[in-house]
Amino acid sequence: MAKKRILSGMRPTGPLHLGNLHGALANWKEMQDKYECFFFIADWHALTTDYDATEPIRGHILDVFLDWLSVGLSPEKCTLFVQSYVKEHAELFLLLSMITPLPWLERNPTYKEQIAELKNRDLSNFGFLGYPVLQAADIIMYKANGVPVGIDQAPHVELTREIARRFNHFYGDVFPIPETILTESSKILGMDRRKMSKSYNNAIFLSDSPEVIQNKVGQMIYRPQRARRADPGNPDICNVFSFHQLYSDRETAEGIDAECREAKIGCVECKKMMAANLVKALDPIREKRSFYETRPDTVRAIIEDGNQKARAVARQTMEEVRAAVKI
């Protein structure tokens, strides 16, 4: 029995961080052993908000690929590619835009949220409004059976389903209707207790050196009410302890929990222990990244091979689409 096909992507915004690891990447790594997976770098999507700052995008593409390889995504198990290399995405996006009602895009909750969040940017362009149509083209191009996303992206997949149904209604059953595979969002917060994000300048990156990690952990905001060493702490609301739960062994985490509540351990010592365990956990990822950083030709070959595999599938799909639309 053929494996179900999965597709997901990431915008190239720079090196990836722990939030990416415990959100998408951990799920992708498991999925590559169970499904036929297509994972792509959505560089065209980056233009919807960064159309006036495109210079870093090519470098960011390489950063993301290095991080993908370093965490264990394997080109032997999945297809890794760059969206803009597969020009068929643009053609399918154009055709889908012809049949997508404008109100579908205007009522998209993610669109409204991003307009509010990025209120200092001029986003009054079709590319930003039509972002979900390009996303639909990305997904149905590969006839994906499922799309792993966090709850915030679920409306986009639902819109993709509606667009696929509408295309099939007009032109025949060309596309399967993809299912939403809800994945658990990362619970890791940034150093300032907000969502970990490059834009907030609060992220710990997978490529950070041990010294940088130790420095960032030292800056972490914990519970400000614990003003004195003798004050008991509350691990339940402590950002540092949430990292212990992920990166320290169970015995250590339980010991930290008890000692913090009884004020037997201070925050500085707690942070140092956590930083050491985090550095140790990320060592294999950093080592693998270093391996690929010194072999740029190998990385370029992996990217090119994935691009070719993806485009072969896309060409076949577009032949079917053109025949169905009769153009």
Language model feature labels by segment:
Residues 1-4, 297:
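A short, charged/proline- and glycine-enriched loop
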Residues 3-137, 286, 290:
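N-terminal Rossmann-like or analogous alpha/beta NTP/dinucleotide-binding catalytic cores
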Residues 12, 147-148, 202:
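A generic structural motif
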Residues 18-20, 155, 161-327:
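Conserved nucleotide- and phosphate/pyrophosphate-binding catalytic cores
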Residues 30, 70-71, 98, 139, ...:
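Residue-level signal for well-ordered alpha-helical scaffold segments within enzymatic catalytic domains
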Residues 91-93, 103, 107-116, 120-170, ...:
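Classical nucleotidyltransferase
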Residues 102-106, 141-146, 248-256, 286:
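Short helix-capping/linker segments at secondary-structure and domain boundaries
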